[in-house]
């Protein structure tokens, strides 16, 4: 096939060099040959010499396309507008409609080529909308309009157009790009479930695209579907065994499993990435957190330090080392590292982390200032509200604490720690119905968490429902058998019920456990 193409190409070049051969051709044929041979100036000269009439607008469209190839975008815009004006005054018919749609499409491309950003894209949208009104099955017009909407940040309009493209008889390449582009918009909007479906469809079209598998895996990770994330990261690695981001992504997904075997499997992935590229910072930082999770704080500190030495501007490495320093009891070093991170990038997360360090150092006033600054910087950052609420609780400002816990839940509705703290606070404030609902929600999501049963027992105790309190304390002890606090409180509850012997036995058990703990 290529031999025939090369022969045809050679023949066209030969004709272009023969005046006699060209003179026997029509002006349109001559222009096409000159344009094919990339002699755009000559092609434009031929077409400029033609006196057009309304029935020959194809000439006008051809001239504009040649000018576009010659990078004469402004001239192309003028010609296209001239053609559209002529068509608007001619008898309408299928040919005129097709030429008009083609002119409008190319006019949109010209606007995009000119690069006048907002105005360019808005003008392109106007012209593409006109093209769509003339041919509602033009998937290319819808697709290009979606691209323009994306450029001017009209993301919902872009999503609508991409949806229409997929309903039309688009080519496979356009469908692939549509799924990709729409998926990226969903990621930007934080709608990872929708993005996931688009990336999956794209992966079905392009099965050997490792980046698509990686994007799909990342969406699974974002919506806490960690096993599915591992599967897609593995697929990406089968396509490309040296895909570093896939090793790190799979390792981070394994870390979310929450058991030792998965943590060790994650370590293998991080080490594999570092074996391929020892200077790969993402893998180094993730490996540091992996070692921290295993309680190997000094080794974790070493790897965060290597990351900092490799890239002194990497604020995530400073943050990781600050966390490890805090766990090792070196509060001053932790403060130095988090301040170093904030000099590079001040985020709500870093401010909140610094607030935690202030709390460890006993500086609650400074901690509260950092939490408030974090909220100012990012009013949707749940953890800052939660930590500030805990300080209010500590100072017995329970109404403020409850308000801050509610704000934290607004932005992180499934956080069981915030729910339980609000339940405890509402119990103190005697908002019993709200407290009851919060405790029920926590137990539904965390049925094997001993602490929630212990705290709900306090709630029942306040309501003088001692039998229900005893049931919850029994459940707490079944989950955490040697807790002196629970035995001590159950003794108090049983005393209220009148179970004196059982209460005395619980008091004695609590004392024995406390004595044992003091000896250890």
Curated annotation (Swiss-Prot):
A Pfam family assignment: TPR_16
Superkingdom classification of source: Eukaryota
Keywords, in A-Z order: Repeat, TPR repeat
Keyword Repeat: yes
Keyword Electron transport: no
Disulfide bridge map: none
Spans of repeat TPR: 57-90, 101-138, 139-172, 176-209, 210-243, 245-280, 281-314, 320-347, 348-381, 382-415, 416-449, 450-483, 484-517
Descriptive protein name: Tetratricopeptide repeat protein 6
Organism (species): Homo sapiens (Human)
């Amino acid at each position: 096939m290529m031999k025939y193409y090369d022969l045809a190409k050679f023949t066209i070049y030969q004709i272009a060099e023969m005046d006699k051969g060209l003179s026997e051709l029509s002006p349109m044929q001559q222009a096409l040959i000159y344009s094919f041979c990339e002699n755009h100036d000559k092609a434009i000269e031929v077409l400029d010499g033609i006196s057009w009439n309304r029935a020959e607008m194809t000439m006008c469209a051809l001239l504009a396309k040649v000018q576009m190839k010659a990078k004469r975008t402004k001239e192309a815009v003028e010609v296209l507008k001239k053609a559209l004006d002529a068509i608007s005054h001619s008898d309408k018919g299928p040919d005129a409609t097709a030429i008009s749609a083609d002119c409008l499409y190319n006019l949109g491309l010209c606007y995009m080529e000119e690069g006048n950003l907002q105005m360019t894209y808005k003008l392109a949208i106007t012209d593409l909308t006109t093209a769509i009104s003339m041919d509602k099955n033009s998937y290319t017009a819808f697709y290009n309009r979606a691209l323009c909407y994306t450029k001017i940040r009209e993301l919902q309009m872009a999503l609508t157009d991409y949806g229409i493209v997929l309903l039309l008889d688009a080519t496979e390449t356009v469908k692939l790009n549509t799924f990709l582009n729409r998926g990226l918009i969903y990621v930007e909007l934080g709608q990872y479930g929708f993005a996931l479906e688009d990336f999956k469809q794209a992966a079905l079209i392009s099965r050997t695209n490792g980046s698509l598998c990686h994007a799909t895996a990342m969406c699974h990770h974002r919506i806490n579907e960690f096993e599915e994330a591992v599967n897609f990261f593995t697929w990406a690695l089968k396509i490309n065994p040296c895909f570093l981001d896939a090793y790190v992504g799979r390792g981070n997904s394994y870390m979310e499993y929450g058991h030792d075997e998965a943590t060790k499997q994650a370590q293998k992935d991080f080490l594999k990435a570092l074996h391929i590229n020892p200077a790969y910072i993402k893998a180094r930082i993730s490996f540091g957190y992996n070692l921290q999770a295993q309680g190997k704080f000094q080794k974790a500190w070493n790897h965060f330090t290597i990351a900092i030495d490799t890239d002194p501007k990497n604020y995530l490495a400073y943050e990781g080392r600050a966390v490890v320093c805090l766990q090792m009891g070196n509060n001053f070093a932790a403060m130095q590292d988090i301040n170093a991170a904030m000099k590079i990038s001040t985020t709500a997360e870093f401010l909140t982390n610094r607030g935690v360090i202030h709390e460890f150092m006993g500086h609650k006033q400074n901690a509260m200032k950092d939490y408030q600054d974090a909220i100012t910087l990012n009013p949707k950052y749940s953890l800052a509200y939660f930590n500030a609420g805990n300080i209010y609780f500590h100072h017995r400002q329970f109404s403020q604490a409850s308000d801050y816990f509610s704000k934290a839940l607004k932005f992180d509705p499934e956080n069981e720690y915030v729910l339980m703290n609000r339940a405890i606070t509402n119990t103190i404030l005697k908002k019993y119905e709200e407290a009851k609902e919060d405790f029920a929600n926590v137990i539904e999501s965390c049925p094997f968490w001993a602490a929630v049963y212990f705290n709900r027992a306090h709630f029942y105790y306040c309501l003088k429902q001692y039998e229900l309190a005893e049931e919850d304390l029994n459940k707490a002890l079944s989950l955490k058998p040697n807790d002196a606090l629970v035995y001590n409180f159950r003794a108090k509850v049983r005393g209220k019920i009148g179970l004196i012997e059982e209460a005395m036995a619980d008091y004695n058990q609590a004392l024995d456990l406390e004595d044992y703990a003091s000896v250890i």
